[in-house]
């Protein structure tokens, strides 16, 4: 499900969700200047990709990592007090599969989740109190 400030594609163009509402049994979203039922055609998630990661400050490390027999490229984002490691595989059933590991303040505190889409990455960042990163992605 989508959340406020998530980025999605609407008719092939990236749009940010600026409001969500429920009326009766239908969910509506507002994408910048467009308001409509979420079930309408045209809204699609954005797949996590290597170009997206590079555009948003992740650095590709020349290291191939294996999880559950799948090969993943390693991307790293470093900032004050935390390290984000994102491992992204080649296509698996039509989708890139990403595995996100966030270490905060050099402690054992971390989140380890599997993701496919940009809005899922945004929501994982928000859960780790990295709202400013989640809400400022470049598409």
Region roles according to the model:
Residues 58-64, 136-139:
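Short amphipathic alpha-helical segments with coiled-coil-like heptad repeat character
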Residues 24-34, 38, 62-118:
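Acidic, low-complexity, intrinsically disordered interaction modules
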Residues 6, 13-26:
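Short beta-strand-centered aromatic/proline hotspots
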Residues 125, 129-139:
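Charged phosphate-binding loop/patch that engages nucleotide di/tri-phosphates or the phosphate backbone
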Residues 34-62, 112-128:
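Intrinsically disordered, low-complexity, charged/polar segments
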Residues 6, 51, 56, 73-75:
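Residue-level detector of beta-strand structural context in well-folded domains
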């Amino acid at each position: 499900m989508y959340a406020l400030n998530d980025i999605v594609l609407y008719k092939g163009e990236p749009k940010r969700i600026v409001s969500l509402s429920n009326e009766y049994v239908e969910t509506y979203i507002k994408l910048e200047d467009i308001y409509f039922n979420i079930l309408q055609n045209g809204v699609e998630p954005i797949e996590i990709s290597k170009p997206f990661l590079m555009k948003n400050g992740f650095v590709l490390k020349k290291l191939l990592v294996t999880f559950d027999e799948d090969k993943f490229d390693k991307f790293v984002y470093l900032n004050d007090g935390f390290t984000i490691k994102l491992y992204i595989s080649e296509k698996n059933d039509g989708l890139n599969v990403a595995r996100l590991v966030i270490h905060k303040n050099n402690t054992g505190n971390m989140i380890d989740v599997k993701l496919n889409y940009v809005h899922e990455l945004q929501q994982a960042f928000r859960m780790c109190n990295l709202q400013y990163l989640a809400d400022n992605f470049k598409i």
